[in-house]
């Protein structure tokens, strides 16, 4: 049975406590944690996992994945990725989500990334984890675009974190058209709505944009997807809305997905 989580990144400018409290208040039982340098740094992957355990227990939440995006074209990015994998192994989180160029949208080049991804994938495999590369940036702008890169990587521990809004933001393709091409490689899904087109940052609550979530869920069900879903809302970027508005958007998103049979 798929688990529906709230993504802590939806509370980007707020503390870990505020994010977890808001996710729980909005009715979620699961969470995707965030340890993204320079963006949403709720988890200290060099610190004691007990800190996060106590926080999750306080709000009655279980972690299903962690976002640890870093620039995997660089040694520093690899080192952060390895630190996230080690933390996830200690904590017991099975999926580490990341992106080739980290959070920032940079011009990506394949060869530097290929020099490091094998090391990260081997570490994840040894730890019994999966590295899920997000639909994000240039080299993985869509599922269709990502397939040759995934084939070149050719590692069983490397899967896809499919973002239903990023695919349109970076490639112009619609999730319901692109997802069937890559559904069998998906290990994690960011359920994110969009009101904009290519290059437009406008990611509202689920149901307020034009992503066809009924179709998205049907495609993944038909593909036998059993992994987690994480609701991610990034609004119109910074500055983030007031905390109560973020929590309400997460609650409304959960209700919208319940109408499609996901709760």
Which residues make up each language-model segment?
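Histidine-acidic metal/acid-base catalytic patches
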Residues: 1-29, 53, 57-60, 92, ...
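Structural motif corresponding to the early beta-alpha repeats
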Residues: 28-29, 33-116, 125-130, 221, ...
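Conserved anion-binding
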Residues: 134, 138
